[in-house]
Amino acid sequence: MAMAAAASLLPASAAPTLPGRAFRPPRNSTPTASLSCDGGSRCRGVGLGVILGGCRAQGVRRNAAAETYVPGSGKYIAPDYLVKKVTAKELEELVRGERKVPLIVDFYATWCGPCVLMAQDIEMLAVEYENNALFVKVDTDDEYELARDMQVRGLPTLYFFSPDQSKDALRTEGLIPIDMIRNIIDNEL
């Protein structure tokens, strides 16, 4: 808890360093800590409180006020996100069903750094396009066969489905700017 205060109130150079972890502020944000892990872990430069590849900055939580403590577990859990995680069956129903708004599907993995970065943009867009688009996400580790069938090769991959089912879906792969996503939703669908 004290480390969280130090990491958020002090400049990165004054923040404490844990063995195997480096603290530094992310670009374009207020000073907070980010971490990198050694020992073959997949974590590098992600925001605190995000668990990737089993690596987490010890004693530091993203936003304790926004998390709920699970008694007896010693864990804090974040509330549900705005973008719903769906299964293969749910996605099939959404794609084949009648829609009045575009459907945007985010194929991601919890261990994927660019996926975590883009998830923040997707959440913001879900609020911005609340009544004009439907955003869902698919965890490729949980839905491997669906990801394979949808030819998801790199992460994150976004699919854009128009409400007009005669139009082909659009696909992007990799971390793309939020303005590009807006442009696709506003002009291409």
Curated annotation (Swiss-Prot):
Stored PROSITE patterns? THIOREDOXIN_1, THIOREDOXIN_2
Q: Where is this site: Contributes to redox potential value?
A: G113, P114
Note the Gene3D superfamilies from the entry. Answer: Glutaredoxin (3.40.30.10)
SUPFAM superfamilies attached here?
Answer: Thioredoxin-like
UniProt subcellular location: Plastid, Chloroplast
| Disulphide bridges, residue numbers | C112-C115
For molecular function, the Gene Ontology terms on record are:
disulfide oxidoreductase activity; protein-disulfide reductase [NAD(P)H] activity
Q: Which Pfam families match?
A: Thioredoxin
> Which residue numbers delimit the Thioredoxin domain?
72-189
Annotated Gene Ontology cellular component terms: chloroplast
> Which residues carry out catalysis?
C112, C115
- Keywords noted in UniProt: Chloroplast, Disulfide bond, Electron transport, Oxidoreductase, Plastid, Redox-active center, Transit peptide, Transport
The entry's function note states:
Probable thiol-disulfide oxidoreductase that may play a role in proper chloroplast development.
| Name of the featured protein | Thioredoxin-like protein CITRX, chloroplastic
